Amino acid sequence: MSSTTPAPQTVYQWTADVAVRFLKEWNFLLGIILLFITIILQFGYTSRSMFIYVVKMIILWLMWPLTIVLCIFNCVYALNNVYLGFSIVFTIVSIVMWIMYFVNSIRLFIRTGSWWSFNPETNNLMCIDVKGTVYVRPIIEDYHTLTATNVRGHLYMQGVKLGTGFSLSDLPAYVTVAKVSHLCTYKRAFLDKVDGVSGFAVYVKSKVGNYRLPSNKPSGADTALLRI
């Protein structure tokens, strides 16, 4: 009987020549992908296009699992022990931060009941009750004042369009901004009519507490907030 010797396995090494060849082969596709992501991140705002903003949120959300997969890949195919150590640290940090994101998002969802709570860009959700409907929209910063603008029936809150068919009399007395740890209440301090169908209102932060939004409440009822 003749003994068979197993063929040696090919060991792939990532060298400078391999990297250059990879870029030459995939340069065009990578350029298109990066250009698409750059345009989405640059122009993805709720005040411009809600569709582009949602696409932006999907891209940002996919960054975490993609980062974790790449870190695990680096752990499996580490060049040496130094790279392995850094890869393990980066993997742990990525997983911990992703878990923290889900924990904070679930806490915010419990407070507001809105799927915008899983927005990876911000943990500030503006909530306004107009005609019995609670509109929830993400805002980037913690503002001291909020502005509602009505232009011939088109209602905008901080530049974000909420809908049509509204008047200044439909604006509530209070607006809230939900955060992970607390809820900020804004009281209407100023209302001015530009003409018969247009105008604006300014809301000023008046109270901060650990509340959640009830499922149904009268328009502008500050006392309807539920403590948690």
From Swiss-Prot:
**Could you state one GO cellular component term attached to this entry?**
virion membrane
Intervals, Virion surface compartment: 2-25, 78-85
Q: Which UniProt keywords apply?
A: Glycoprotein, Host Golgi apparatus, Host membrane, Host-virus interaction, Membrane, Transmembrane, Transmembrane helix, Viral envelope protein, Viral immunoevasion, Viral matrix protein, Virion
Protein location:
Virion membrane; Host Golgi apparatus membrane
Segments crossing the lipid bilayer: 26-46, 57-77, 86-106
Give residue spans on the Intravirion membrane side.
47-56, 107-228
One MF term in the entry's GO annotations: structural constituent of virion
Q: Major place of localization?
A: virion
Give a Pfam family name.
CoV_M
Look up and give the membrane topology term.
Answer: Multi-pass membrane protein
Q: Which CDD domains match?
A: HCoV-like_M
Per its database record, what is this protein's job? Component of the viral envelope that plays a central role in virus morphogenesis and assembly via its interactions with other viral proteins.
This protein's assembly is summarised as: Homomultimer. Interacts with envelope E protein in the budding compartment of the host cell, which is located between endoplasmic reticulum and the Golgi complex. Forms a complex with HE and S proteins. Interacts with nucleocapsid N protein. This interaction probably participates in RNA packaging into the virus.
Give the record's family classification: Belongs to the betacoronaviruses M protein family.
**Protein name in the entry:** Membrane protein
The organism's taxonomic lineage, starting at the top: Viruses, Riboviria, Orthornavirae, Pisuviricota, Pisoniviricetes
